[in-house]
From Swiss-Prot:
It comes from Microcystis aeruginosa (strain NIES-843 / IAM M-2473). Pfam families: DeoC. It catalyses: 2-deoxy-D-ribose 5-phosphate = D-glyceraldehyde 3-phosphate + acetaldehyde. One of its GO terms (biological process) is carbohydrate catabolic process. The lineage of its organism: Bacteria, Bacillati, Cyanobacteriota, Cyanophyceae, Oscillatoriophycideae. CDD domains: DeoC. The keyword Cytoplasm applies. Belongs to the DeoC/FbaB aldolase family. DeoC type 1 subfamily. The gene is deoC. This is Deoxyribose-phosphate aldolase. Its EC number is 4.1.2.4.
Amino acid sequence: MAITDSDLDLAQYIDHSLLIPTATSEQLEAYCQQAEQYRFPTVCVYPAAVKQAVQLLHGKKTLVSTVIGFPAGATTSAVKRYEALEAVDNGAKELDVVINLGWLKDGKSEQLFQEIASICQETGQTVKAILETSQLTDTEKRLAAEICMDAGVSYLKTSTGWFGGATVSDVKFLKEISKGRVGIKASGGIRTLEQAIALIRAGATRLGTSRGVDLVRQQKAAFEE
C-alpha cells in the first residue's frame, strides 16, 4: 500500500517523547500543547516531569507516560517498583519499563519475570517492556518477549533509542512472537514518514518518537501532493 493511504491516522500511533536530560519546563509545555493539538495518545517524559505534564494536560485526552529504569534497566527491582509507583501517584497512566538485560543474558528468567510482574500488578497501569532488541540475539528476544508477556505487560517495546533504534525486522519478529497478545511499540530513530509507515505495516501499534509533529506534517504534505 502507498504510504499516503487515507486509512492510516498516523497521529494515533505516536507517543510524543521528550526524553533528553536537558529538557526544560518550556519544552515540556510545548510538547504537551503539540500532543493535545495533534491528538497523540501520550506524552512520554522522565519521571521528574510527570507531575507537571499531568497538570498541563488536565482534562485533555492525551495521557502521560513515563520511563522506568531508563535507559539501562540495571537499577534494583525495589528502585524500579518505587519509581513506577511514584510515577502512578503523580498521574502517569503508562509505564515504559526497561528490562534487566544482564539477568536475561545470565539466564535469570525468574528474577526478570518477578520484577516485571510486580510492576504490572502493583501499579495496575499499562506497562510496556523495553527489550532493547539491538543488544539481543533472536533467541534472547523471544525469551524476553515470552517472559514479559507472561508477566502481564501490555506492550513489547523495541528500544530506548540510546543503543540503537527500531527496525522493521524486529517489529515483525515481535509481532510473530506475540501472536496478538500484546501491542508492539517501535522506538528509536524514527525520523521519516517512510520509516513510520514501514514500522506500522510491520506490526507496530505505537511509535515512540520526538518527531511526531514532523511525521504528521510529512504525511499531510504527501496527501496534498
